[in-house]
Structure formats: structure tokens, C-alpha cells
Amino acid sequence: MGRFVKVDLEYGERPLADVLDAVERLAARPHDGIFLNRAPGDRAGLGGVALAVRVAHRVGFELVLLNPGRPVDPGYRALGAAICVFDGDWAEYQRWSGEGAAPGDGHLVHGVPAAQAENARKMMEWRGAGFGLVAETRTW
């Protein structure tokens, strides 16, 4: 797994100027990409997220990961960013229907006992996840 710098979008509650400043400032750090955590996924948040993604690309982030943690409005699919459509615990992931996910989307699953890690990875594969993370604790 690469080195990602992280910016918390606070589901659209963080002022956009603060988000953009953080994106520009973090571009100077060694990185393989940027993780825009707790991104809004609804139509109302699309404009601010689109601007953050454009700025991230402009300042040198080739890989942008959006983490709304749930399925998104279709407009997000055109932003040129990878999207995590699941961010939750292992019990929730096992119950999740996968509705709203597209092949290649990301899945972040925490609370996975070590003995269940391989099962969680297989479940991600069956659900068409393009990338993901299985962890015992939530570290992101």
C-alpha cells in the first residue's frame, strides 16, 4: 500500500477554503496520492468535492481517493477519482447488500478478526471491489 496524505472533508461541513489549503499544503509531502476522507456523496456536495479533486490533480496528486463510505450520486463517477463506497465494520459489511457500488469501487472494512481476514478479502473480491482495506482496527 502506498503513502497517502489525508484531508478530512467532514462530509461537506469543513469550509472549502480550508480543504483547498490543506490539499495544496500536503502536496509538498512525499506521497503516492491523497485520501479525501469523509467526503460527501450527495448531489449537494458534488461541487466542492469536484473542486478539491481538480486542485489535487493540479498540485501533483495523480491518485485521488474519495471516501464517502457509502454509494454516491452518479455525478461523482466523472471526477477522475477512485471512490470508496463502503467504510464500516465487519458485521455491517457482511450484512451490506452492495447496492449502489460499481465494479472497481473501494471497500474499507475494520473490526475484522485476524482469523476472518481472508474471508473478508474474498468477500471484497466477490463484490467486485477494485481496492480495499481489511483491518482489525479503524486507522483511517
Cite the ranges covered by each PLM segment:
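Glycan-processing catalytic domains of CAZymes
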Residues: 1-140
